[in-house]
A protein has these predicted regions:
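Residues that line or immediately flank small-molecule/substrate-binding pockets and catalytic motifs
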Residues: 61, 94, 122, 148, ...
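Processing junctions and N-termini across compartments
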Residues: 44, 48-51, 265, 330-333
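Conserved alpha-helical substructure of the radical SAM core
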Residues: 3-12, 16-131, 135-139, 143
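Radical SAM/AdoMet-radical enzyme domain recognition
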Residues: 72-91, 100-224
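Cys/His-rich zinc-coordinating "finger/knuckle" motifs
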Residues: 57, 61-64, 278, 343-346, ...
Length: 364
């Protein structure tokens, strides 16, 4: 059965039409933005073992085989495959990639191959260990994105369900800020916040904490994807009308107080935003992640046939993340088919519609 997003009456060049294999390879699925990094990116999942237990984790409780680590020889082959395919940016994902036994060697091999942007997405608890962090930086790590979702110990530890994790993350961030000032991490250091029902009201305070108290200059918020532990949970996944006013306040604060810093958001359908924002291309290019994110392919361990656009080879699922969201993980309600913004908007997480329905979405 075709996904609801695939409008059978849509023309082949419509954003609602499933991409052909050639179009997927071309990755011409993003709008032009002068400040977007044009390097083609791949994110390699090292395994889903993690030392946090976030209440919104999309993996929930992974199967034992999914918690196993990717063998190092497989990692080397995968890095070589993507470099030969044209990628010059690579990110290591988990689970938690800093627990991967060969993360330093993998970083060094990526640099040896010629990757110019080498990143990890991490909860950063292990990065408080300076000798370990120094090894990663010296191996060639150029960017760190840190998952942190609260500005207080109470909030962060409630969301991650790990005691004393807040202090460890703060210690890691302060050290990474120091190293960035020394010239490390030329591709940046950021915190990624999953905006959810427990923390969205604290967004302005979180901005002040991360920018002013910890000294960061890059903050990203993503609306929660209600799968895994958060599936079907309206407390964790609030309705957009409750959250959007806090997003707008955050943008206003960024314009007034943190204009030199980077603040971006993702996961908000454009029809949920006020006209003054969604119709202002200058603001969208500055703040909307879909205008700024790298074109990203993904490689994840997979047994079986998979589904949707993913291609399975050598036990790995490979897909483009922008296409995966639009065609497999999100729905386009009926309103999307007549919306003037459909070329930019990716739709709505399927899990959100399962919780709240789609009556709130209207064409613009």
């Amino acid at each position: 059965m075709a996904h609801a997003l695939f409008n059978q009456s849509a023309k082949s060049n419509s954003p609602l039409a499933k991409p052909t294999e050639a179009a997927g390879e071309a990755r011409e699925n993003q709008l032009f933005n002068e400040i977007r990094d044009v390097r083609r990116n791949v994110e390699i999942n090292i395994g889903k073992a993690c030392n946090n237990r976030c209440v919104f984790c999309i993996d929930g409780l992974p199967k034992r085989e999914d918690r196993s680590y990717m063998p190092y020889e497989d990692m080397r082959r995968e890095l070589k495959f993507w470099y030969d395919s044209g990628s010059r940016s690579v990110g290591f994902l988990g689970g938690e990639p800093t627990t991967y036994p060969w993360i330093v060697q993998s970083t060094a091999y990526a640099r040896e191959l010629g990757f110019t942007r080498i990143a990890i997405a991490t909860n950063a608890t292990k990065l408080r260990l300076r000798h370990f962090t120094d090894k990663l930086l010296d191996a060639g790590l150029t960017r760190v994105t840190i998952s942190m979702h609260g500005h207080t110990a109470e909030l962060e530890e409630r969301l991650t369900r790990v005691p004393k994790v807040y202090a460890k993350k703060c210690e890691a961030i302060r050290y990474l800020v120091e190293k960035k000032k020394e010239g490390y991490l030329p591709d940046g250091l950021s915190v990624n916040i999953v905006l959810n029902g427990w923390n969205y009201r604290a967004l302005p305070k979180m901005m002040r904490f991360f920018y002013d108290d910890l000294g960061l200059d890059d903050l990203r918020i993503n609306f929660v994807r209600p799968e895994g532990y958060a599936e079907g949970d309206p407390e964790i996944c609030p309705p957009f009308p409750k959250v959007v006013p806090y997003l707008i306040k955050a943008i206003a604060l960024s314009e007034r107080h943190w204009k030199r810093e980077t603040f971006t958001f993702g996961g908000f359908p454009l029809c949920t935003l006020p006209p003054a924002l969604r119709n202002n291309e200058t603001l969208l290019k500055r703040y909307m992640g879909e205008y700024r994110d790298l074109s990203t392919d993904c490689s994840v361990r997979q047994e079986g046939d998979g589904f949707g656009i993913e291609q399975i080879e050598d036990g790995r699922s490979r897909f483009n993340w922008q296409d995966r969201k639009r065609f497999d993980l999100k729905n386009a309600p009926d309103a999307c088919h007549t919306c003037s913004k459909v070329h930019l908007c990716e739709g709505v997480w399927r899990g959100y519609i399962d919780i709240h329905g789609d009556d709130e979405f209207t064409p613009v």
